[in-house]
Amino acid sequence: MIRKLVDFAMENRFLVLAAALVLFGWGAISFHQLPIEAYPDVADNYVEIITQWPGISAEQIEQQVTIPLETVMNGIPHVTHLRSFSLFGLSDLKLIFDDEEENAWNRERVLERLAQVSLPPGASPQMGTDWSPVGQIYFFTLHSTNPQYDVMELKSIEDWVVEKNFKAVPNIVDVSSFGGPTREYQVRVDPDKLISYGLSIAQVEQQLTNNNTNAGGSFIESGQQQINIREVGLVRSVGDIANTVITTRSGTPLRIKDIATVSQGPKIRLGQFARAIHREDGTIVDNDDVVSGIVLLRKGADADEALAGIHAKVKELNERILPPGVKVVPFIDRSDLVHYTTHTVLHNLTEGIILVVIVLFLFVGNVRAAIIVALTIPFALLFAATCLNLKGIPANLLSLGALDFGMVVDGAVVMVENIVRHMTNPQNASRKPSEVIREAAHEVQRPVFYAIAIIITAYLPIFTLQRVEGRLFRPMAWTVAFALLGALIFSMLIAPVLSTLLFRNGVREWDNPLMTYSITHYRKAVKSAIKRPAMTVGIGIAGLCLAFMFTYMGAIGSEFLPHLDEGAIWVRGTLASSVGPSEAVALANQGRTLLCSFPEVPDCTSQVGRPDDGTDATGFFNTEYFVNLKPKEQWRPEFHQDKDRLIAAMDRELEKIPGVNWGFSQPIEDNMEEAVSGVKGELATKIYGDDLKVLEQKADEIVNTMHRVRGIEDLGVFRALGQPNLNFEVDREQAARYQINVADIQDAIQTAAGGNALTQVLQ
């Protein structure tokens, strides 16, 4: 079979060359269209359920929301485990699935179970969007030079204009907004007036809700026309709310404005976002309250295509849609990292091709032969790109970096070198070059085929890997296998045909001094090894033992996920769990100022707490910073373009802020680590038990022990306790004496302390 393929290629040379050119062109187009990821998506399939219940303690959230949700969700097919998190006002539940079904199927099953759960009034569960940890592809802020638009106005523009437009971009699943106060109409009731008029909070709430509706009244006929009837009763202004009638006394209406003041104000915030810019002149422009957003890519979608749509939409927003002076300003654009990664890979590939050509010329000693062999590299690369594109597998730095050019050109080297050897043999001088080349190809066709086939077979176990390791290494295995298949096709079919064209006038024999020198010393080494077999075997065993020692005794480090320099730093500061919003924001401002003071940092953002939609399950005890970095060539000499040195210097500066535990990572890397392990960190130790106090005590003991482990830089404990509560216990006998229900008391306390959202005003 192999012989027939070679014969077919030799007999149809122009057809083979035409097919090769078509494959080259197709491969170039496929390489241009091939989705390229900076980082492989290794996260498991998961579905997130976010339940917000404002004002409710973490303990009550756990008992009345999280546990019922866990109970209902247990038993869903293909669920491997559940992760739950209960915070003040928030329950976050993640269901981790295996790879048996598509995530759309998983979401349908979760939605079916979600309809069966019964939760307390006010608790509103919803499924999180279908995105992956590498799906945060575009971070932006809204910037205004128009004094008419303050941060509250920008928040409204973000929620009602920007978010809607970004969601219209194909494969954009959601936009997560962070920062800026949400506008609301606030009715501040005077308790004394409420008592004097004999009213209750419930009565006021009921009338406010009832007086913000529209209704329909069928239609009437007027002449030849039908006129629809609308009863317009929606609230449009502060005056509409203030004039809402609660009740009447002796024929006189009692309005909201008689017992309360009505105004516009900010909703109670769950987090705050800020940004500082380090200008070229050394000055720092700091804005401690900014409206930001994160554009989320649908899981499995093409990031390049989505980013192109985002860039077009941003241009449209800035030029046509947003008010004058308001602009969308990006501070993280995944396309920058993708372009940097692509440039790095292509640069390395180009250098590799040049080095291979030089080495081939030095050892083969023939320029035409070296060119034939070198053509294997672009052909194999473009062939792999075509196959990956057809199979829908995106390329990434790990898969492209795994291409070994020496392995790719191995078969072509054997084929072409044997052809050159036959062509320079004086016995073949009178024969046709095509006959000599065919004979030479037949001579090595089987060894070349089996050698490359064996290498491809060696990658088969990687295709059986599951879950995280499979998603990490399978794209690499596919890329290498396709490239080797392309190299095999080139070596067996195209290389002999090219030889008939380039060697049709024969091959001049050249006494290669480098090869002569290498062969001479190689023969001496082989003879010496054969004469001393015991020593040769002993050296081999000793080398093997040393390799095992370096590998398994810690001399060579190891990591599960590959490290990619993202050109930025992600800093997390963990505060005391009882910290208040004002103190957390003040500490975040200090940290942002210190980080942005480094000349290597062009800008720095900070976020405290969580977004209003609850998509990041954390509290005010958590502060996170995105630290953008200039190109390493612009860093100060003292850091020697070493990111670890810069991080160490930042850590020393941040230690000036007491009571904060600092950790350093990178934006994508941080998301991936949390997705894989379920915690915000590279490595985590989990302790299981029933007593939270004992668990925290043991956690502190483990931390004290780990501090002595060499190589650990950032270490901390995630506290499950420490949030103080002010408990109101209802005296049921006194409540019964005054004929007051417990629910009325709770509603009054909730409204007085945190307010109660009654209805919605559309403007």
Set out the residue ranges of the language-model regions:
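Transmembrane helices with small-residue packing motifs
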Residues: 21-56, 115-123, 389-396, 462-472, ...
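Surface-exposed amphipathic alpha-helical segments in non-transmembrane regions
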Residues: 17, 24, 29, 33, ...
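Hydrophobic, glycine/alanine-rich multi-pass transmembrane helices and their short helix-loop junctions
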Residues: 358-363, 380-397, 449-501, 549
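Juxtamembrane "pre-transmembrane" interface segments
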Residues: 178-183, 188, 289-358, 436-439, ...
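Hydrophobic transmembrane alpha-helices and their membrane-interface caps
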Residues: 26-32, 48, 354-421, 482
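Signature of alpha-helical transmembrane segments and their immediate interfacial
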Residues: 1-36, 442-444, 510-560, 602, ...
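Helix-loop junctions and hydrophobic alpha-helical segments within the transmembrane domains
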Residues: 331, 338, 342, 416, ...
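Interfacial segments of transmembrane alpha-helices in multi-pass membrane proteins
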Residues: 3, 7-13, 299-304, 339-395, ...
